[in-house]
Curated annotation (Swiss-Prot):
It comes from Cellvibrio japonicus (strain Ueda107). This is Probable alpha-L-glutamate ligase. GO terms for biological process: protein modification process; SOS response; translation. The lineage of its organism: Bacteria, Pseudomonadati, Pseudomonadota, Gammaproteobacteria, Cellvibrionales. GO terms for cellular component: cytoplasm. Mg(2+) 1 binds at residues 248, 260.
Length: 301
């Protein structure tokens, strides 16, 4: 197959591993910076141009779209879809997962376990938001944050009210969520490919930190999932319509709770912790499922 990897940095671990996996399995692969693409929107022959070259003949696309360029990345993916190219991550699925509020609404509708969450545009009484999630301590999350950025732990009522007021003054959209004490600073990353969890790891925050993201100094080790955790991760990915996803769970007294469904999960942490060839599993999935698409088909999920 001729495969395009949409990535702004070919030196990133995940991009390098996907290139290696494609090459080792005999595919032609190119890394394309989406910000250097420009789109020819025409009903007869939609096209994408890249640094003066018309992109043609691709069988499949692997989007690795950073959060900061989601809007333009979605436009490029949609254009590939209009051209009939198979996209591992569909535009609809990517858009759902990047909108944290929409993602939680979809997961809630499917009956998937979630932390108690409240959201508002302009609440004059912060105490009402706090009451909805069961009081303090609680977690406040900017809707646009990634990799643990834009997340604050408020341990007291006064602290929570102050942060809510600050976010409101900035006109920032944010979520208020209950703090799951029994998770003890750990979460579980489930890596889903297709309809299977192919790897899982437990991430633990460093001392003095409540966010377990590896980008923030957290550590990771292999963990065994319960059948319920496995089913929850798969159902969460399918709800978003994602064929490849990193589903983050908290282990709580009422069962697994989904924190986030990541549409562009990093490979370095999960491959290092588990020793598995995740990049190879992703390419193998594409080999079995990549088929030309039509512009009339609806996104899954």
């Amino acid at each position: 197959m001729k495969i395009a990897i949409l990535s702004r940095n070919r030196r990133l671990y995940s991009t390098r591993r996907l290139v290696e996996a494609c090459t080792q399995r005999g595919h032609e692969v190119r890394v394309i910076d989406i910000l250097k693409c420009y789109i020819d929107i025409a009903s007869a022959s939609p096209a994408i141009w890249y640094m003066g070259e018309k992109l043609e003949g691709f069988d499949a696309v692997i989007p690795r779209i950073g959060a900061s360029v989601t809007h333009y990345g979605l436009a490029v993916i949609r254009q590939f879809e209009m051209m009939g190219v198979y996209c591992l991550t569909e535009s609809i699925a990517l858009g759902r997962s990047r909108d944290k509020l929409r993602a939680l609404q979809l997961l809630s509708r499917k009956g998937i376990g979630l932390p108690k969450t409240s959201f508002a545009y302009n609440v004059y009484d912060a105490r009402e938001l706090i009451k909805l999630v069961g009081g303090t301590p609680l977690v406040l999350k900017l809707c646009e944050g990634t990799q643990g950025k834009g997340i604050v732990l408020a341990e007291t009522q006064k602290a929570a009210e102050s942060v809510i007021e600050a976010f409101r003054e900035l006109r920032a959209e944010f979520l208020v969520q209950e703090f799951i004490k029994e998770a003890n600073g750990s979460d579980v990353r489930c890596f889903v490919v297709g309809d299977k969890v192919v790897a899982s790891m437990e991430r633990t925050a460093q001392d003095g930190e409540f966010r377990s993201n590896l980008h923030r100094g957290g550590t990771a080790k292999v963990t065994k999932l319960s059948p319920t955790e496995r089913r929850t991760a798969i159902k969460a990915a399918q709800t978003m319509g994602l064929k490849v996803a990193g589903v983050d769970l908290l282990r709580s007294s009422r069962g697994p709770l989904v924190m986030e469904v990541n549409s562009s999960p990093g490979l370095e942490g999960i491959e290092s912790a588990t020793g598995k060839d995740i990049a190879g599993l992703i390419v193998a999935y594409m080999e079995e499922n990549a088929k030309p698409v039509t512009t009339t088909r609806a996104g899954k999920g």
